């Protein structure tokens, strides 16, 4: 199976993202500065019948962070809100 990548710009750099990564980034960007729940992200990517994808979400977020962040282990843009979801920030927000 061949993965198709789409190019998009983020924080002044061009990124090659998979369809799943792009869908996640779009959902987070639409809600920039606000928490997006795990359920909302899964539904946006995999549809209403996303049961079983919750663990996959973390893997895709990690891959997205590796592309977005200078230091993926200490993210400045894509923040985890423990027990709730994720938040895309402008980099300086907590």
Model-predicted regions and their roles:
Residues 1-11, 84, 92:
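Short boundary/linker motifs that mark transitions into or out of structured domains
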Residues 73, 93-94:
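Short, intrinsically disordered, low-complexity terminal/loop segments
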Residues 88:
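HATPase_c (GHKL) ATP-binding subdomain of two-component histidine kinases
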Residues 49, 92-93:
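Catalytic strand-loop-helix junctions within cyclic-nucleotide turnover domains
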Residues 12-77, 82-84:
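Positively charged, aromatic-enriched patches within helix-turn-helix-type DNA-binding elements
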């Amino acid at each position: 199976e061949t993965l198709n990548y789409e190019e998009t710009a983020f924080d002044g750099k061009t990124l090659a993202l998979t369809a799943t990564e792009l869908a996640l980034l779009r959902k987070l960007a639409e809600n920039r500065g606000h928490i997006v729940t795990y359920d909302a992200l899964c539904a946006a990517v995999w549809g209403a019948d996303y049961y079983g994808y919750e663990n996959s979400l973390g893997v895709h977020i990690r891959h997205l962070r590796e592309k977005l962040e200078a230091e993926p282990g200490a993210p400045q843009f894509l923040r985890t809100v423990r027990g709730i979801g994720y938040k895309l920030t402008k980099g300086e927000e907590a």
